[in-house]
Every structure is written in C-alpha cells, then in structure tokens.
C-alpha cells in the first residue's frame, strides 16, 4: 500500500523490509517520488486525496505524480479518474494495472482469453534470490518436487518429468549480499538453457518462471500471447515457436511460502 507517499508491505516500510536486502536491486527508499528523482526524473508530487489526483490530471503540478492507495477501492478510484485522461501514462503494480483495465473494460467485463488449465507435470524455473521466492520453492520441494541446479545432470529431471513429478530448477544461493549484474545475467541464461534442454527432451505442459531476469532469459525476444492472470501477480502467456507450454510468470518477492503449492493444486483441479 502507499500512504502519504510512502510504500508499506506488511505494515513495514519497504526500505526496512526484505526488499532492502535484495541481492539484485535493493530498495533504498520507500518513497517512489524520491526514486523517480534519483533516476533523473523531474520533481514528483505526492497525491493523497481524490481532489489532488483530479487537479493533477487537469494539468496542475509537475510531470510526475505518486498517488496514495491503501485498498482495492482506492485503486479503482484512481483508475476511474485516470481513464478520463488517456494522454497520461499510468504505471504501477499488477493490482494498479488491473484496476486500470477494469476502468477501461467496464465493470463485469469478461476476459478476452479464457483462463487456462494448468496441466502437470510443472517445471518451475527460479533465479530470484528473494526470501519469498526461496521459501516457495523450498516448500514445493518439501512437498515432493525434484530440485535441480544448472550444473546438475539433466537426466534425473527428465526422468522425473516423464514420471509426472514436478521439477524445481533453481540457481544457487551465493554467500554475498549483492550480485553483480553480469553474474545475474549469466545465471539467468544458464537456467534458461537447462530449461530449454528439458523441454526438448520431454513434453513440459506448464512452466512457472520466478523473477524478472529469469523470465527475460526464458522468454527471450520471441513474440508471446499474454492472456491475463491466473492468480494475483501471476501472469500467463503462450510463447510462439516450437513449444506449446503454458508459461506463468511471477515476481520473486510476492506471495506466501505455499504460493506455488496452492497455485499448482488449485489450477490443476477440473
């Protein structure tokens, strides 16, 4: 949520939580306006009330604005105001974009693409080092999935997938607090290469990719058909090319430890 221009997660400023210890891109401020300024943007105004948002959209104030939102109703309110000003670029979390889509499509609109059926076995590819992501893959392995790393012999993973067992392909866990950008890219590419090798050896109906760098490496620059979400923060798409796999992507710092188990169990139900 964002209150007074400050972003909180679990009632804690994000700069005081696990996001501040992210190995790839640690959060250094809980104020988006400050981050915009640090990135070279012009001054940004923080908007607390609907009237503030309405006035800014009408042209009063600097080029950037950060609006408060603590509930879904707040997001819907901001999205409705924004919808009347299509010249303004709206950016935010998946929930923000979802509210914007609702404002554009209208209340009760049906999705253009039906929600897909998640067929097993599932290959999970995780390059994120966020504690939330690691807790999720650990829970799935504890529930019976096979854990493999880029340096492992893929034979065991192929055999597991052929037997209908879920496989978790995850990067190692370095001892240092920070990861160099080049190392992060190399790790993501290694994960993607092994994932491609597994998909070439055995039919993998569903691939779940955790982490932005990992998703970029797995999806590459091929066109993809993005259909929507299967759960909060979890998007689904179907890449073009030889594979027919359903690909789900999710951020590393999102969800409870049981998120993968619940996602797979719920969506594999008839």
Sequence positions of predicted segments:
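Catalytic cores of soluble, metal-dependent hydrolases
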Residues: 80, 173-228, 241, 265-268
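Cap/lid and interdomain-hinge subdomains that line or gate substrate/regulatory clefts
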Residues: 1-77, 82, 270
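General beta-strand structural signal in soluble alpha/beta enzymes
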Residues: 43-49, 65-69, 89-93, 98-99, ...
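Short, flexible loop segments at boundaries between secondary-structure elements
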Residues: 93-120, 229-253
